[in-house]
From Swiss-Prot:
Naturally occurring in which organism (per UniProt): Aquifex aeolicus (strain VF5)
Secreted is among the record's keywords: no
Record flagged with keyword DNA repair: no
Protein name: Glutamate racemase
Protein keywords: Cell shape, Cell wall biogenesis/degradation, Isomerase, Peptidoglycan synthesis
Binding site for substrate: D7, S8, Y39, G40, N71, T72, T179, H180
Pathway: Cell wall biogenesis; peptidoglycan biosynthesis
Protein purpose: Provides the (R)-glutamate required for cell wall biosynthesis.
Catalyzed reaction equations: L-glutamate = D-glutamate
């Protein structure tokens, strides 16, 4: 079985890692749209267009199932992708919401994400339907920090404090509403001591169990639309192994 995964950049490899750990025999093709990262500052129309282009690229690679490992694309494009493509399509928002509701004792839940994800209200609406009190905030500097490989040290620490100071004492659970954010999880946990920090990558992998046959050769192909300065370092950091990335321009519709 072959699974396709796409994200706006390198952060979606956190989902890729969780899926490979859960289903080690499946073949996986990953696409990071690093030439156009971040999606979180784009209009809905642009996010949908980029998402369809990424999905088409993976369709041409012969995938049997698609995971949208980008919260912004999940918020704005998931339903259109489900309608347009002939294979099952999964996002990362619903699994993260379910995991947060399971872990929270007070139902006072925080959500952080890109500007577009927070503006969409996708997390807030799903949590409020379950009776949660929701606190949300956009953290637009987190993705550039991760893409630059700046995940530890004084700069990310100060940025985390700047964005998350209003959550202290208000929430018992925080959803990382962007697949880049788990790379900053240590700094976030250090600042919000005692708060459940929800990384939806593992929850997303679990949500596939009724649809994935753990069959194949366990192969992995990594495609990116641009070779960013820290790409190889991020691959090693997230996946724990060195995998040669392939750079492609086939995604773009000219």
């Amino acid at each position: 079985m072959k699974i396709g995964i796409f994200d706006s950049g390198a952060g979606g490899m956190t989902v890729l890692k969780a899926i490979r750990e859960a289903y080690p025999n499946v073949d996986v093709v990953y696409l990071g749209d690093t030439a156009r990262v971040p999606y979180g500052i784009r209009s809905k129309e642009t996010i949908v267009r980029y998402s369809k282009e990424c999905a088409n690229f993976l369709k041409d690679k012969g995938v049997d199932l698609l995971v949208v490992a980008c919260n912004t694309a999940s918020a704005y494009a998931l339903e259109e992708l489900k309608r347009e493509f002939p294979f099952p399509v999964f996002g990362v928002i619903e699994p993260g919401v379910k995991e947060a509701l399971r872990k929270s004792k007070t139902k006072r839940i925080g959500v952080i994400g890109t500007q577009a994800t927070i503006k969409s209200g996708a997390y807030q609406e799903a949590l409020k339907r379950a009776g949660a009190e929701v606190y949300s905030k956009a953290c637009p500097l987190f993705v550039p920090l991760v893409e630059e490989g700046m995940i530890e040290g004084e700069i990310p620490k100060k940025v985390v404090e700047h964005y998350l100071k209003d959550f202290k004492g208000k929430v018992d659970t925080l959803i990382l509403g962007c697949t880049h954010y788990p790379l900053l999880k240590r700094e976030i946990q250090n600042f919000l001591e005692g708060v459940n920090v929800i990384d939806s990558s593992r929850a997303t992998a679990k949500s596939l169990k009724d649809f994935v046959k753990n069959e194949g050769s366990g192969s992995l192909e990594l495609y990116f639309t641009d070779r960013s300065q820290n790409l190889e370092r991020l691959i090693k950091l997230i996946l724990g192994e060195e995998v040669e990335p392939k750079i492609t321009s086939e995604v773009f519709v000219l």
